[in-house]
C-alpha cells in the first residue's frame, strides 16, 4: 500500500511539474503586453480549437459569416495550433488596413517554392519587400499604365467583336451556351494578346494552349491546401508552363518591336536586360508573373460576368433599365465600346453590385508580420489574418438590404451627391483586396466585365430553363463559383455588324 501511495505521489508530482513547465513555456513564448487582450473568441475544443465551428457549411465564407453574426466582427480563432484573426465587417476591415497596412502585407510562403504555378517567384505570392515593390511599380508604370491600356484597346475591341460573332453563331443554331465558359475564352484571349501580343493568336494555337494550361492550373487549385500530396501534379503543370513561356520569351527576344507594338513581355524583358534597374528580375520571375496574370485576370473576371448576368436575368427591371441606357448612349448602329463606359453609369453600377454580392475570392488571407494592436486588442506575430470579403460586402450595418441585387445603391444620385457618403461607400466596398496589396488591375478588370456584359445585354435576349436562375454557391480552391453554371440560349436582338 505504501508503495502505491509513493507511486501515486510521484505521478502527481510529475503532473504538477508538467503543468508548471507548460505555463512557463506559454508565459515565455506567447506572453502579450500588459493590459492587452486577444480579440474575443468563441468556445473551443481541446486540440482542434475552433475547427468544429467551420464545419457548419461546406462554404468557408458562410461558416465564417455565421460565426461573426453570433460572436462579433473581430474574432480570435485557433485551428489546431494555427492562430488566426477573423474580420467580418467593413469598419473593422478598414481599421486593420488603416493602422496595419504594411504589417498585413505578407502572404503565406508557398509549399512548392520552385513551381511557376502557386510558387514563390511571382508577384502575388512574393513577400512584401524590394522585389514586390519593384514589380508593383513596373506593373503600374509600364504594364497597366493608362497609355498601355489605350494602345491595347484595339485588341480588346477585336476580341469583343469575335465574342459577339460566336454568340450570333450559337443563336442561329439555337444552341445554349455556358456563360462562364464563353466569358473565360474572351478574357483568356484578351490577356493573351495583351501579354504576348504578336505571339498570340487563334491560328497558331498559342491562345488555345494558354487556355489549356490555365484550366489545368485551376483544376489544381482545389488541391492547393494539400500541395505536398500533389507536388508531382503541380510541378508537371509548372514545367508545361515553363516550356510554353520560354518559347514565347525567345520569340520576343528574336523579334524586337517598336514602342507602338510592345506588349507586357516586351516591357518585362526590357527590365530583365536593364543592368541599372532598381531590382534585377529573373526569367523565372517573368514567367511566374505571366502565369499569375492569366490565373488572376481570366477566371475571376469570367466568374463575375457569369454571376452578374445571372442576377440581371433574375431581375427583369434591371435588364430593362440597363438596356435602355446602353441603347440611348451607344445608339442602334454599332457595338458598345470602351469609350462609352464613362457615359454608362448604370452599367458600372450593375457590375459593382455583382462584385459586391459575388466576390471572386470570398476570403482574403494575409499574415501579421509583427505583433500589433487592433482596436485595443493584441494580435501576436505570424497570426493569420482572414478577411471575409463576402461578409464585409453584405454587412447589414453598412448596406441597406445587403442580400438584394440593387445596382442603384452605387449611383451618385442615390447618395445625394454627398462627398462624405461617397467616401464612406468606397471604404466599405472591398472586392479586390485591401491596402497596398489591392489588385493593381482593377481598372482593366472593370473594362473586361463592363464591355462583355454590355455587349450581351445590347445584342441578345437570353432564354433560360425555368423562371429563375438557380444561384447556389460553390467553392473551388479559393474561388466562389456557381454550383450550377449559367446555361442559356442567345437570341439575336440587335446585329451591330449589319451596318
Curated annotation (Swiss-Prot):
The keyword Heme applies. Its EC number is 1.14.-.-. It is a single-pass membrane protein. Its cofactor is heme. GO terms for cellular component: membrane; plasmodesma. Keywords: Heme, Iron, Membrane, Metal-binding, Monooxygenase, Oxidoreductase, Transmembrane, Transmembrane helix. The chain crosses the membrane at residues 4-24. It is found in: Membrane. InterPro entries: Cyt_P450 (IPR001128), Cyt_P450_CS (IPR017972), Cyt_P450_E_grp-I (IPR002401), Cyt_P450_sf (IPR036396), Plant_metabolite_P450s (IPR051103). Its main location: membrane. One of its GO terms (molecular function) is iron ion binding. It is an enzyme of class 1 (oxidoreductase). Heme binds at residue 439. May be involved in hydroxylation of the triterpene marneral. Belongs to the cytochrome P450 family. PANTHER family: CYTOCHROME P450 705A1-RELATED (PTHR24298:SF630), FLAVONOID 3'-MONOOXYGENASE-RELATED (PTHR24298). This is Cytochrome P450 705A12. It comes from Arabidopsis thaliana (Mouse-ear cress).
